Amino acid sequence: MFKHTLLTALAVLISLQAPMCLSDDWRKSDITQLVMLGTGTPNPFPDRSGPSLAIVVNGEPYLVDFGPGVVRQASSLSPEYGGKIRGLAVENLKHAFLTHLHSDHTVGLPDLILTAWTVGRDSPLKLFGPEGTKHMADKVLE
């Protein structure tokens, strides 16, 4: 049920931007971007970050899964560190979705909760996920 809801929400977000594809310069637009922040596996490959992606809609990032290095990967793509995606500045990481609670998808959660807060996120992280997600986040904050 949760995965269906998540996939439906993501499809709606992306489909709202469909008219952009009709213009000649849609690739230059930053209205909607799908950014692979990590494509790694549970194995600790040094050249791959853990599984995570960001859907950036009108500059607002929505993270899906938070493998190892998610905050650093996002920040490396922000203008502060030489990237071009303003929405991925650490203080903008405010919406997060977990698909499941395997460690390779969750180990970046403490970094996402705490680092973004220390660098100026002005509201609590909005976290959505399967049963057990709230408990995990609460333990990080203890």
Map each language-model feature to its residues.
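Short, linear, compositionally biased motifs with a strong N-terminal bias
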Residues: 11-12
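N-terminal signal peptide c-region/cleavage motif recognized by signal peptidases
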Residues: 15-18
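Binuclear metal-dependent hydrolase catalytic cores
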Residues: 21-142
